[in-house]
Amino acid sequence: MDPIRSRTPSPARELLPGPQPDGVQPTADRGVSPPAGGPLDGLPARRTMSRTRLPSPPAPSPAFSAGSFSDLLRQFDPSLFNTSLFDSLPPFGAHHTEAATGEWDEVQSGLRAADAPPPTMRVAVTAARPPRAKPAPRRRAAQPSDASPAAQVDLRTLGYSQQQQEKIKPKVRSTVAQHHEALVGHGFTHAHIVALSQHPAALGTVAVKYQDMIAALPEATHEAIVGVGKQWSGARALEALLTVAGELRGPPLQLDTGQLLKIAKRGGVTAVEAVHAWRNALTGAPLNLTPEQVVAIASHDGGKQALETVQRLLPVLCQAHGLTPQQVVAIASNGGGKQALETVQRLLPVLCQAHGLTPQQVVAIASNSGGKQALETVQRLLPVLCQAHGLTPEQVVAIASNGGGKQALETVQRLLPVLCQAHGLTPEQVVAIASNIGGKQALETVQALLPVLCQAHGLTPEQVVAIASNIGGKQALETVQALLPVLCQAHGLTPEQVVAIASNIGGKQALETVQALLPVLCQAHGLTPEQVVAIASHDGGKQALETVQRLLPVLCQAHGLTPEQVVAIASHDGGKQALETVQRLLPVLCQAHGLTPQQVVAIASNGGGKQALETVQRLLPVLCQAHGLTPEQVVAIASNSGGKQALETVQALLPVLCQAHGLTPEQVVAIASNSGGKQALETVQRLLPVLCQAHGLTPEQVVAIASHDGGKQALETVQRLLPVLCQAHGLTPEQVVAIASHDGGKQALETVQRLLPVLCQAHGLTPEQVVAIASHDGGKQALETVQRLLPVLCQAHGLTPQQVVAIASNGGGRPALETVQRLLPVLCQAHGLTPEQVVAIASHDGGKQALETVQRLLPVLCQAHGLTPQQVVAIASNGGGRPALESIVAQLSRPDPALAALTNDHLVALACLGGRPALDAVKKGLPHAPALIKRTNRRIPERTSHRVADHAQVVRVLGFFQCHSHPAQAFDDAMTQFGMSRHGLLQLFRRVGVTELEARSGTLPPASQRWDRILQASGMKRAKPSPTSTQTPDQASLHAFADSLERDLDAPSPMHEGDQTRASSRKRSRSDRAVTGPSAQQSFEVRVPEQRDALHLPLSWRVKRPRTSIGGGLPDPGTPTAADLAASSTVMREQDEDPFAGAADDFPAFNEEELAWLMELLPQ
């Protein structure tokens, strides 16, 4: 029988003074071992002795000799190694081949979690202690194991679910049980404790020292503490923060709690200690790093080594290689930053001189996890990929500039021929798939699943590429294969909706969450499937859906929001955070800052809504009091992606731009009120003098170019291409400005430079026509489509080049042209329309949607409701044709009492006059209309038919103009066609909101713009209030109709596909009156739409398009977005200011006869 050993603790097991390695943390209930020979000698060890440490090795080695380390590894149970290390790495990060010293220190701390003492301590202890015999079996049985009482603790008795208990390793459950009561008392939930159990040592540290942590880090949340503690050196990192937080909060860094926790979570204990030790050197000369830069570098695996390397190499890289400190920081601020910096120092000259890359491209490649390996692979494969596979250096750089760039480049080299030859993909599509984190895996999955998804599930190769071209594309493709049948058959989604959900970062999780929550959100919360799809179709869709399920009742019942507004907030990247911030800040912003709930929703309904709301709370008083902005202007700036940065930049640059550059605050606001407003403002500050002095532009033209999404890039491209386009291609500066003054101006200018000679020489277009096509959002895509389809449409479909140009010269020109190619035969042969009528419908913003709606509703309107095809065409040919036709169908199918008295002819005339806004305005009740009707009846008691034009004739005249193939001749031809004098025709047009100049040139404004003029001329629309005026709720409701007026594309029904053009048309409608002079107006045959003063940006402009992932181009404006599916857009736009402020300023008031004509059209 084995002898009973003494329980006197060995010196190696005694707690040492000072900080303990993770796994040997002291606890409050740790007692002192009884002396040898005591009454408890020989009994099994007390469980309290092992609660915060893992089991001891069966037998210590005599000394740390040559073979002792291998013995230690044999004794080490691999299951004890904390896998949270790998969870904390990027999902497709680079695989580093070098192990830094500090990283090895942390690996050793993981080994110490097995209760093995440090090697130096073992040398000292075992030298004075002879080797022990093999432990007795009974002693081994006393150790905690899967079969021991410690491992069999049932945590369900403490309220943990079975699933939560299974997530906790058996050997850790006793530690969880020991500290459960203390942690729960500190406010930690069961889920928090389960997460913290990933690193058992942190359980005791947090339980014992939570009060000290809150004292040192008062803003720390439970989630933040758990986020640090569950890391592989989390307990030590928290201990380090307790020691150094006070000094790091003071000069020179003055870090806040969030920054301190970020360093501790991502960089570990070594990073915290390094920041503390080197804080003065990092922020002083010659490095002069900002606190934000120090945090960025330190907040990664290997942060300590990166900080050390920055101190050594930053001066060298800046002085000898021409990099900026910002570029050096960008390279260092990733996992493996040390190795990346050293590789940039070594390879930058080679890549630039021998391979033709720019320093910026080298920095882009290096500024990712695994930058070292990516740079080396670019050096090796760039010649091969370009010469043998036909890629451009830019495409190679795009592939390499992601985590895992090395593997992606190697996979492109291997699979590009296969994917192109066997699967029909283009090199551009292969590059798009590869240019993301995890590009290697995505390419391999496309190779495996493309045939299956296309043949068995009916997807197109383009849809498969869209799904794969995101982070996590591999998983998304596999999930689409698994869930597409279920989501379509059981939940009623379309394949297109499934693709939309999957084509984002986290598409796999979003699809699974839609499967789980779609029935709940629809049945319990009243959402439509389209709204659920809209929420899910963004990065982080899973989290957004779960948050909508949780917060929708609260936001609606406690805060008065509508479900549509909640959907609008959630339907963006970061929707979860935006919803939570609205819940928290809505009362504050409304009560303390005077904003309306609608304005708060508008700010939140963008990517980065959370940060924008927090910045509005902070800067609204400053911008209004110190800089003279109005709350409306602050909201306009904030209501874009990147609103936070735009607001901060306005605060910084408004005085400079106004005082040094002569801009007005209104112009600064106009520039800032777009996605990328920060960058646009900075570029205006930098390039305004150059563009004005060297290129002859006016400040107003510079502002016009900058006042769009992508304003920075557009300004830089104008600086570069203006001389070329004017000297080599014969354009005027005004034409260049017109092209650049739209979303995607950069791409449009570059495409004009490339295609102008081709379109003019090979296709017979004039430079003016090319400029007209390019001068819209999506001009690049429209020009490329004209080049491709002009021969087809003219030869196969009988259109003229002028008609093709007319279709292309609108927002969404590309989808309109493609739809004409597809539907022209159908509409002419099956529905009896003429090619001229099809062209008239297509030649407006949203032409694609209007054509599809005519195809769908023409039989219904004609057969079931008695309208003529000419009437349908007249409604569809006025801009905003789709919503106008849908409103007519809805009224004829389910009459609204406000419109019930109108005949079909009256309804058609009203729809032609003002589209859906006119019909909606009458339904809601026109302000002042009853008094106006009475006044008119009193003053003109006898209204005879000769005093007013026949309403049917108005429809015929409008339809004639819209379908005329030569607009400039339409006026003269109309006089002949209808037997009208010049004065009579002008009088008719004036009654429908058209000026003499517009009528004579044949370029009629959209219906909603004409309706706006009619309302103002008739006195039924209030003048624009001053920015400082306020409205009572009664006033606001009285004039609600005016706030709902839309331009060409009105808010679609949530049951229909959204108009991508909606955002672009509103953007384009901003008047250059505040930012451009008359010189910006072009004399093209195709009208350049009026633009609106950016000061009064309607909140509905905040709906943004998804970004493209490759090629640098903007999304095609005709592409439907998930956001358009949300009914929230309609409600949002009901709060908008009139989108055509100033459009009717010069339109004179109606006289009494004109009022009488109008009143005869309206319900009495």
Swiss-Prot record:
The keyword DNA-binding applies. Residues 142-151 have a biased composition (Low complexity). GO terms for biological process: symbiont-mediated perturbation of host programmed cell death; symbiont-mediated perturbation of host transcription. Core repeat 17. repeats lie at residues 867-886. Forms a homodimer in the plant cell cytoplasm, prior to nuclear import. Interacts with the plant cell importin alpha-1 (Caimp alpha-1) and importin alpha-2 (Caimp alpha-2) via the nuclear localization signal NLS2, but not via NLS3. Residues 1135-1164 are annotated as: Acidic activation domain AAD. Residues 131-141 have a biased composition (Basic residues). A motif (Nuclear localization signal NLS3) lies at residues 1104-1107. A motif (Nuclear localization signal NLS1) lies at residues 1021-1024. This is Avirulence protein AvrBs3. Cryptic repeat - repeats lie at residues 225-254. By varying the BSR in each core repeat, DNA-binding domains can be generated that target specific DNA sequences and thus act as transcription factors. By combining the central DNA-binding domain with the catalytic domain of the restriction endonuclease FokI, TALE-nuclease (TALEN) enzymes able to target specific dsDNA sequences can be created that enable eukaryotic genome modification. Other potential uses as transcriptional repressors, for transposon targeting, DNA methylation or histone tail modifictions are also possible. One of its GO terms (molecular function) is sequence-specific DNA binding. It holds the Pfam family TAL_effector. It comes from Xanthomonas euvesicatoria. The N-terminus is responsible for protein export from the bacteria. It comes from the Bacteria.
